[in-house]
A protein has these predicted regions:
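Vicinal oxygen chelate
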Residues: 1, 18-40, 48-110
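Short acidic/polar capping segments at secondary-structure boundaries
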Residues: 1-3, 23-24
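Short, structured motif recognition centered on aromatic/hydrophobic residues
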Residues: 2, 6-9, 15, 32, ...
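Short helix/strand-bridging catalytic loops that position acidic/His residues to coordinate divalent metals
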Residues: 23, 45-48
Length: 110
């Protein structure tokens, strides 16, 4: 539930909901800004009711290709176009054992 989770985040952090985006297919995204951090809350009809849960983290990096080349393809997927225009995304492989899904996002400089 987007509003329930958003309200809980606002109570815990003082950061109000800044924007809600309809992402299509009944998926909604809500955004909170905590300083330089953007927290994205996502909900969809296929999500089970219950308490809010953490799906994963996305970190913005200056040069996503440099990070991908540094850690290698066994650790991080090859950067590909993200849903956000002009952005690239790469995900850490589950075999790395981070426990929570982690992705990196950077500008598409091509």
């Amino acid at each position: 539930d987007l509003m329930r989770t958003s309200d809980a985040l606002t109570v815990a952090t003082g950061a109000p909901l800044k924007r809600v985006r309809d992402a299509g297919n009944n998926v909604q995204q809500g955004f909170h800004r905590l300083g330089s951090v953007v927290v994205e809350i996502v909900t969809a009809p296929s999500m089970h009711p219950g308490p809010a849960s953490l799906w994963g983290f996305v970190l913005n990096v200056k040069d996503i290709y440099a990070v991908a080349n540094h850690v290698g393809p066994d650790v991080l997927s090859i950067p590909k176009p993200a849903v956000q225009a002009g952005k690239l995304i790469a995900t850490f492989r589950s075999s790395v054992g981070l426990g929570v899904p982690l992705a990196l996002m950077g500008q598409d400089t091509n």
